[in-house]
Amino acid sequence: MTRQCNCSEGSCGSGRYEELVLERMLYSARLKETVARRDSDVIAAMATMIAETFRNGGKVLLCGNGGSAADAQHLAAELTIRYRSSVNRPALPAIALSTDTSALTAGANDLGFDEVFSRLTEAYGRPGDLLLGLSTSGNSPNVLKALQTARKLGLKTLALLGGDGGTIRPHADLAVVVPHTGSADRTQECHIAIGHVIVELVESMMGYA
């Protein structure tokens, strides 16, 4: 239903705001289409690596900052609980490293914020596990150090990034880089869409869907 503006001469600016809505949402859709057409094989390969990790008794660690921390927690919850209510399956072990405020603040205070995720990766990660790092810039120092630590410990590494992939990209076994710069929002929208597809694929690959 189209709602008409009742103000005189459209002085509320609703037309301008409607144009902004259209512009933002269409750009977001085009960005997702670009990533889907370019990286569908990489996204499927990421899901395969995660499914193999679970089949072999490993767990998935996830990390990111700000909105990316929220995305990491979001995806960890869908792996641990389930993605869709129509799927009945066992819990899958996934841990978002941004959820323990005591550990995060102790690490930031004692070691520095750049070290918080690497320290938790050292604590929880074991050979055969997998770390997924999220960074809209591709340059988050604490995510970078977590992936470096993960590799040293024998974990597989995945990354969802933005821009040109930044300093993190070379440290991921597989990475999807969203070609957007200047703000985190559109990149995060792509990351969560990719994450949802990955979780759906993992459930299917493991025979649950």
Curated annotation (Swiss-Prot):
Pfam families: SIS_2
InterPro entries in alphabetical order: GmhA/DiaA, Phosphoheptose_Isoase, SIS_dom, SIS_dom_sf, SIS_GmhA/DiaA_subfam
Annotated pathway: Carbohydrate biosynthesis; D-glycero-D-manno-heptose 7-phosphate biosynthesis; D-glycero-alpha-D-manno-heptose 7-phosphate and D-glycero-beta-D-manno-heptose 7-phosphate from sedoheptulose 7-phosphate: step 1/1
Gene3D superfamilies: Glucose-6-phosphate isomerase like protein, domain 1
Top EC group: isomerase
Location of the protein in the cell: Cytoplasm
Domain SIS stretches: 50-209
Membership in a protein family: Belongs to the SIS family. GmhA subfamily.
Entry protein name: Phosphoheptose isomerase
Species assigned in the record: Chlorobaculum parvum (strain DSM 263 / NCIMB 8327)
Gene name of the encoded protein: gmhA
